[in-house]
């Protein structure tokens, strides 16, 4: 606040919201795991915010680093459909993972996506991975491929 007061022109007596926004950084770092959580919970707003953040930082978040995490999440979701008991503990024991992982990602994913949709999502992730490596895609940038994939997953 002291720095804002010092930077304030002599003719002004009040600090405005625009001056505060201009003097601080309003960006937030996101992780691939937050992105995975947003997709599993089908949180369209958060998934799109994170996707735009990744698109604006392609060197720090290349598509080839994002896709394996998303693939693993949806592959685990597909496997969970075959668990003999569809409870939190039943799925956790059957898959050999912690129950908090089931509670955080698997159960919301099972509520939001059918088994057929998950198979289609896995296919779309594999297709996006191939396209990011130049197969059937000579020039589409990674950010555009990610946008297409996220739209397919969420809609």
Model-based region annotation:
Residues 3, 53, 124-127:
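Residues within well-ordered alpha-helical secondary structure of globular protein domains
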Residues 5, 32, 74-81, 129-133, ...:
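A structural signal for well-ordered alpha-helices, especially hydrophobic packing surfaces
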Residues 1-15:
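Short, charge-rich, low-complexity alpha-helical interaction segments
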Residues 69, 120, 124-127, 149-152:
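Charged, amphipathic alpha-helical oligomerization/scaffolding segments
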Residues 139-155:
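Acidic, carboxylate-rich catalytic segments that either coordinate divalent cations
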Residues 107-139:
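C-terminal capping/gating helix-and-loop segments adjacent to ligand/active sites or protein-protein/ligand interfaces
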Residues 12-120:
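Small-residue-rich helix-loop
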Residues 85-90, 137-144:
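Long amphipathic alpha-helical segments
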């Amino acid at each position: 606040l002291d720095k804002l007061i010092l930077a304030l022109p002599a003719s002004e007596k009040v600090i405005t919201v625009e001056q505060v926004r201009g003097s601080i950084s309003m960006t937030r770092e996101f992780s691939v795991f937050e992105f995975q959580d947003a997709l599993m919970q089908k949180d369209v707003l958060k998934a799109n915010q994170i996707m735009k953040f990744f698109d604006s930082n392609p060197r720090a978040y290349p598509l080839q680093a994002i896709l394996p995490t998303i693939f693993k999440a949806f592959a685990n979701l597909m496997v969970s459909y075959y668990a003999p008991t569809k409870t939190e503990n039943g799925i956790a024991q059957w898959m050999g993972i912690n129950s908090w992982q089931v509670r955080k990602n698997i159960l919301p994913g099972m509520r939001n996506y059918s088994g057929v949709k998950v198979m289609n999502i896995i296919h779309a992730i594999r297709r996006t991975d191939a396209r990011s490596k130049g197969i059937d895609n000579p020039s589409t940038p990674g950010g555009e491929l990610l946008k297409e994939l996220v739209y397919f997953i969420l809609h």
